[in-house]
Amino acid sequence: MGSKTEMMERDAMATVAPYAPVTYHRRARVDLDDRLPKPYMPRALQAPDREHPYGTPGHKNYGLSVLQQHVSFFDIDDNGIIYPWETYSGLRMLGFNIIGSLIIAAVINLTLSYATLPGWLPSPFFPIYIHNIHKSKHGSDSKTYDNEGRFMPVNLELIFSKYAKTLPDKLSLGELWEMTEGNRDAWDIFGWIAGKIEWGLLYLLARDEEGFLSKEAIRRCFDGSLFEYCAKIYAGISEDKTAYY
């Protein structure tokens, strides 16, 4: 009876299934609770991980959800609405060139605007309403935001336990590609493309000198503090280029 109970307890906590090799190759972390309280609990205001259990030091949330914080950098006039020209300006502040910024801004506002509008009629100006940004969340993503725009710490940690094969806290370009492939939902073509574009842009923005994207850069991208930091670097206000490596 004892051995049967032990077997049931072991199976109940297993993260690898013998006949599902993918569960072996994409490991789940089981050691989060010691440094990150309740890693499974969605965080509305902060983006914590094991190394930063209280989120980004000094980053103000202003009562916004983590997903709202992620996009608020591009709200240049701080009125809760992001127009294409503001997206363009934000991209330029991050160091993207004119042509790239024009294309990226057009794609972002064209694809995200309608879902965030307060009514049914489309707008010719393609605004993105920050208070409705959770409605623009697409499939085939990392699930690090939940459907209400809260941050899921456990899913950030799973990105690295599953896909960081070279270094435990960094992803290579190939590992990023493998992650976006692993995130794909069936027949979700828009989500497949959107995921690769988003992660590709983040890689261009925040990769280190060795071509890796660090966990800290990714975490700070989720709460938007990375954009503020990179804008200061590009403007020459800050010289510390290693804060998120």
Curated annotation (Swiss-Prot):
Cofactor note: Binds 1 heme b (iron(II)-protoporphyrin IX) group.
Post-translational modification: Phosphorylated. Partially phosphorylated at Ser-225, but not phosphorylated at Ser-72, Tyr-145, Thr-166 or Ser-172. Phosphorylation is not required for catalytic activity.
Null mutant phenotype: No visible phenotype, but retarded growth during the first 48 hours after germination.
GO biological process: defense response; embryo development ending in seed dormancy; lipid droplet organization; negative regulation of lipid storage; oxylipin biosynthetic process; seed maturation
Catalytic activity: RH + ROOH = ROH + ROH
Residues recorded with modification N-acetylglycine: G2
EC number, UniProt record: 1.11.2.3
Cofactor: heme b; Ca(2+)
Activity regulation (UniProt): Inhibited by beta-mercaptoethanol and the organophosphorothioate terbufos.
Residues annotated to bind Ca(2+): D75, D77, N79, E86
Family matches, as InterPro entries: Caleosin-related
Subcellular location field: Microsome membrane; Lipid droplet
Modified-residue entries (Phosphoserine), positions: S225
Domain notes: The proline-knot motif (118-127) may be involved in targeting to lipid bodies. Transmembrane regions are predicted by sequence analysis tools, but these regions probably constitute hydrophobic domains associated to phospholipids.
Its job: Calcium-binding peroxygenase involved in the degradation of storage lipid in oil bodies. May be involved in the interaction between oil bodies and vacuoles during seed germination and in the oxylipin signaling pathways and plant defense responses. Can catalyze sulfoxidation of thiobenzamide, hydroxylation of aniline, epoxidation of oleic acid or intramolecular oxygen transfer.
Subunit structure: Homodimer.
Name assigned to this protein: Peroxygenase 1
